[in-house]
Amino acid sequence: MIKDILSDTEERMKKTIEHLRKDLASLRAGRANPAMLEKIMVDYYGQPTPINQLANITVPEARLLVIQPWDKTIIASIEKAIMKSDLGINPSNDGNVIRLVIPQLTEERRKELVKVLRKRAEEARVAVRNIRRDSNELLKSGEKEKLISEDDNKKGMDDIQKETDRHIKEIDSILQGKEKEIMEV
C-alpha cells in the first residue's frame, strides 16, 4: 500500500512539473519558440484547431518564426488568430507563409514576465504540497484502519516529504533558468 501511495505521489508531482514546463515554454522570452503558438486556436472550417495541426512551424533565426500552412486558404485565419492572441506580435503574410518577428523585450515587459513566472511557479509549488497532503492523509487513514503500522506510516510520510522537497527544488531551478533567460538582454 505504501509503495502504491509513493509511486502515485511521485507520478502526480512529475505531471505538475511537466505542466509547469509546458506553461513556461509558452511565455515569450525574446526568442522564437514554436511552443509560443501552442495555445492559439484557428477557426478551421468552423472548428477551433491548434496552429501546429494546420501548419509547419520553423525557427530559421533566433527571433523569427515561420508558419507554413499546408492549406494556403487558411493563411488569413491563422493571421487573425495570432493578432487576437495575447502574444503582442504582428504577423507578416506574403501569401505562402506567415512570418513572426519576435521583438526585443522591454525592461518593463521583462519584469512583468518575471512576475508571471513566479506566480506560476508558486502555483506549481502549492500543487505539489497539495499532493503531499493528500498522500499523507491516505497514509493516516491506512494507519487508522490498521492496514499499515505506525512506523511504516512515519517512514512513508518521510519519503513523501523527501519527494516533495525534491520536486520543489526542481520547480525552483526551472524558475531560475527561465528568469535568467527572460532577463538576458
Swiss-Prot record:
Organism: Syntrophomonas wolfei subsp. wolfei (strain DSM 2245B / Goettingen)
Protein name per Swiss-Prot or TrEMBL: Ribosome-recycling factor
Gene name of the record: frr
Main function: Responsible for the release of ribosomes from messenger RNA at the termination of protein biosynthesis. May increase the efficiency of translation by recycling ribosomes from one round of translation to another.
Family stated for the protein in its record: Belongs to the RRF family.
Xref: InterPro entries: Ribosome_recyc_fac, Ribosome_recyc_fac_dom, RRF_sf
GO molecular function, one term: ribosomal large subunit binding
Statement: the UniProt record of this protein carries the keyword Protein biosynthesis: yes
Any one of the GO CC terms: cytoplasm
